[in-house]
Amino acid sequence: MVKGQSLQDPFLNALRRERVPVSIYLVNGIKLQGQIESFDQFVILLKNTVSQMVYKHAISTVVPSRPVSHHSNNPGGSNNYHGSNTTAQQQSQEADDAE
């Protein structure tokens, strides 16, 4: 496994497994919403009313609608919690205001 994916894969897998609604912000500022249906090394399959294949290199931020826990590969198997943070919420609000 590539070292950079040791956090990414468990996080995306928890979002997929728990069917957590997510907002995905692209590097060009576009906001996509849906549930992660599947993913691999290069793409995320995002499902809403339709399925969209989103290339990871185009993604800036993935924001879950609620906190998600996943087990990391850290010694001792400690839990890591990820949820919406203030910066992501501000970005979301600014994007909504701009529309």
Curated annotation (Swiss-Prot):
GO cellular component, one term: cytosol
InterPro entries linked to this entry: Hfq, LSM_dom_sf, Sm
Domain (Sm): residue spans on this chain: 9-68
Biased amino acid composition, Low complexity: 70-93
Gene Ontology MF: a single term: RNA binding
Pfam families: Hfq
Function: RNA chaperone that binds small regulatory RNA (sRNAs) and mRNAs to facilitate mRNA translational regulation in response to envelope stress, environmental stress and changes in metabolite concentrations. Also binds with high specificity to tRNAs. Involved in the regulation of the bacteriocin carotovoricin.
Descriptive protein name: RNA-binding protein Hfq
Gene: hfq
